[in-house]
Amino acid sequence: MAAPGECFSVGSQVSCRTCQEQRLQGEVVAFDYPSKMLALKCPSSSGKPNHADILLVNLQYVSEVEIINDRTETPPPLASLNVSKLANKARMEKEEKLSQAYAISAGVSLEGQQLFQTIHKTIKDCKWQEKNIVVMEEVVIAPPYQVENCKGKEGSALGHVRKIVEKHFRDVESQKVMQRSQAQQTQKESALSS
């Protein structure tokens, strides 16, 4: 293990030997003293240039640590965060989770919830209105959420939503067929091995 009071500066070059006798060498990107966790930036294992591996090393399982090059100057400043972008993303995530919770509490079928998620991936302007899915304030999809349940003013919005619903159910059906054939294959294999 590393020496009891040892700290590592960000940017320092460190070499260590793990309990599995593996030699690791890299640049310190973070060090948490209470948990004795060291994050090292090492050359990419894939060999790709401009790529690196980040390894988390628990110093409690390291037999030897050597500081090859200690960084004495102050580390570069942390990258700035776009706080408004993060807040917007958090707000959207919250709205999405509340929408899912509403659908569950309203007793919407699993198929309806899955269709809503599929539509929402393509068209963000969709919401629940009781058990109905409302898309772009123009198209309403009522239970059981099939193509024929899509109602609205004839036009491109209605046609586009119908295509999404159609494709969703085609994909669901092909997934069911694939699962059935895999289950049958597994049954055949287990019957042959018995």
From Swiss-Prot:
SMART domains to which the protein is assigned, alphabetical: AD
Region (Disordered): 175-194
Transport found in the keyword field: no
Comp. bias intervals (Polar residues): 176-194
Stored Pfam families: AD (PF09793), LSM12_LSM (PF21166)
Superkingdom, taxonomy of origin: Eukaryota
UniProt key word DNA repair: no
Main localization category: cytoplasm
Sm domain span: 1-71
Record domain AD: where: 79-173
UniProtKB keywords: Cytoplasm
Compartments (UniProt record): Cytoplasm
CDD domains listed in its UniProt record: LSm12_N (cd01735)
GO annotations of cellular component type: cytoplasm
Annotated GO MF terms: RNA binding
UniProt family annotation: Belongs to the LSM12 family.
PANTHER family: LSM12 HOMOLOG
Role of this protein: Nicotinic acid adenine dinucleotide phosphate (NAADP) binding protein.
The protein's name: Protein LSM12
Provenance organism: Gallus gallus (Chicken)
